Regions:
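Conserved, structured regulatory domains from eukaryotic proteins
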Residues: 204-241
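Long, positively charged leader/targeting segments at protein N-termini
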Residues: 2-190, 195-198, 226-534
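Juxtamembrane helix-loop transition sites at the ends of transmembrane segments
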Residues: 196-197, 202-206
Length: 534
């Protein structure tokens, strides 16, 4: 064996965005398969070059749907797509580095690379690093009892539960946590899953209901178990709110405030679906096992909000994905700059669910979990909050018919196009305008411009005008539907109206940025029509 060590990089062929990512890799001068040769001893310069190549490949491989769609238009000069993507890419690189090698020089090289990656993780741009402001007047007695119950039942934690200013209850690091440290570990026996239904007197009745899902079964079990004074999980149920305050509980005034927004449709559709399910289900539960006083619409909605806002999809050792409630873990708040991103699989060796941190979290800082790559409207509807900061997943979808063309470019395979705040784009030059390239190329195609080389675009500036005017007209109508901004005193309004107003203002900000970009783009194109480039 020579004193070399190869790291093999590959874009999986089953990646749902394989062709899009292949194109992005090509733009970086990379193929779908790359081999990185690490010599026995690397200088700092060569080590940095190796890490840069790994990062370029890793970032693209780990792009999600929204990040792929906005692609290079959202990439910073430093090559960063998003904080989420950067953390995922760096974690992916670490997973590629062998734990051991036969040659000492290889070991030294790999250790140097591993240290360089961990250093990058601790320096991720945009990551929140601030001490949590604890509200001392709120005594977390029930929460403390739950943690004690958890520890008595095998839970291991390096987190402290507290009331945090601006967040409600949250989890604070009780010691410095570095990359890979397990902040929280929960044994399977302390997780609420469908297994408890199968071992209850409910199951013989529920299994006879056509089409009932395991998720619905465990939800119905929870509605009754919550009132069981002898329940194993009583300390957990005692910590749950009487009202979850999600978008599903919005009152009439809040719903009226949402007129003209995308969120209004999302909430109304979700509530209608829940009501239909309840009306279909309850007549089938006329049995002493299901006391009517426990299965009211209000209790059903509460249970739905509990599972929407607190449950997690967990993969068990048998390979089955189950919807579970995880005591203690439910106190971890969401952030677009999370510490914990990989936590959905039970460890076979320990029969427990582990929550390792993917970036450092210092003692006294709030430890954040990623609930998923969700829009703010989804988080408000099902979780009851709006995330702090600019959420890159706040997109406005635009549906178009798929263009049927054998020679079509991969951009046109998008069946749903989208726009978001154009301040997130790094390119506002002509032919970009801060708007996503797939959408622009789709609209160019719709106006008869089949080829989109820079020469073609310069020769068809009238098409550019039409594309920008099309987008401008669409979003002018959206802005009109939102109406004028309210002058209501938010400090003295109900919680749901306050959230509705903030959500509407966020949508207004996004639409305003799109209109500004269209106006600036139209002006730019007009200038080049009058004074063509030489």
């Amino acid at each position: 064996m020579s004193e070399t060590c190869d790291l093999c990089l590959e874009l999986p062929k089953d990646d749902p965005f394989y062709h899009h990512k292949k194109k992005l890799l090509s733009c970086k001068g990379l193929g779908v398969k790359e081999t990185l040769n690490l010599s026995g001893s690397l200088s700092q310069q060569l080590l940095n070059a190796a890490l840069e190549k790994l990062l370029q490949f890793g970032r693209i491989v780990n792009l999600d749907k929204v990040e792929v769609y906005f692609g290079e238009d959202a990439c910073t000069p430093a090559g960063i797509y998003s904080v989420r993507n950067e953390i995922s890419a760096l974690s992916w690189i670490l997973s590629l580095i062998p734990v051991s090698c036969k040659m000492q020089t290889q070991v030294d090289t790999l250790e140097a690379l591993r240290a360089a990656v961990k250093s990058r993780i601790s320096e991720v741009v945009g990551a929140e690093k601030e001490k949590a402001r604890v509200v001392d007047s709120y005594r977390c007695e029930k929460e403390s009892r739950l943690v004690e119950w958890g520890q008595d039942n095998g839970v291991k934690t390096k987190l402290q539960i507290a009331q945090i200013d601006g967040y409600g209850r949250g989890a604070i690091a009780s010691e410095d946590l570095k990359f890979g440290d397990v902040a929280l570990e929960i044994p399977i026996s302390s997780i609420i899953s469908e297994e408890y239904v199968y071992n209850s007197d409910m199951y013989p009745i529920l299994e006879k209901i056509d089409g009932i899902t395991s998720e619905t079964m465990v939800l119905l079990w929870t509605m009754r178990e919550k009132h069981n004074l002898d329940s194993k999980f009583k300390p957990y149920f005692d910590t749950l709110q009487e009202n979850f305050c999600t978008g599903l509980s919005f009152g009439v005034n809040a719903i009226m405030e949402l007129d003209g927004t995308l969120l209004l449709d999302e909430i109304m559709q979700a509530k209608e679906l829940l009501r239909d399910r309840y009306d279909e289900l309850i007549p089938l539960l006329s049995n002493p096992v299901f006391p009517p006083e426990l299965y009211t619409w209000e209790n059903y909605l509460w249970a739905c909000e509990l599972y929407y806002s607190n449950s997690m999809q967990i993969k068990f050792p048998d390979g089955k994905l189950k919807t579970c409630l995880i005591p203690v873990a439910g106190f971890l708040n969401h952030s677009i700059y999370p510490h914990i991103v990989k936590y959905g699989k039970v460890c076979v060796e320990t029969s427990s669910l582990k929550f390792p941190v993917s970036r450092p979290c210092n003692k006294g800082e709030q430890c954040f979990l990623s609930y998923g790559n969700y829009s703010s409207s989804h988080l408000l509807t099902f979780y009851g909050f709006l995330p702090k900061g600019d959420n890159p997943y706040d997109v406005i979808p635009l549906d178009f018919d798929v263009i049927d063309d054998e020679d079509i470019e991969t951009e046109f395979s998008w069946t749903t196009h989208m726009l978001r705040g154009t301040w997130l784009s790094s390119n506002h030059n002509i032919f970009h305008y801060g708007l996503p390239t797939p959408l622009l190329n789709y609209l160019r195609k719709a106006q008869g411009l089949d080829h989109h080389s820079e020469t073609d675009l310069w020769e068809n500036l009238e098409v550019e005008m039409g594309v920008l005017e099309n987008i401008q007209s669409t979003f002018d109508d959206m802005m009109q539907n939102l109406g004028d901004a309210d002058s209501i005193d938010r400090e003295n309004t109900d919680w749901d109206v306050k959230l509705a107003m903030e959500s509407k203002e966020r949508q207004r900000k996004i639409i305003s940025s799109i209109l500004d970009s269209c106006s600036a783009g139209i002006k730019l194109v007009q200038e080049f029509i009058i004074n063509p480039p030489v």
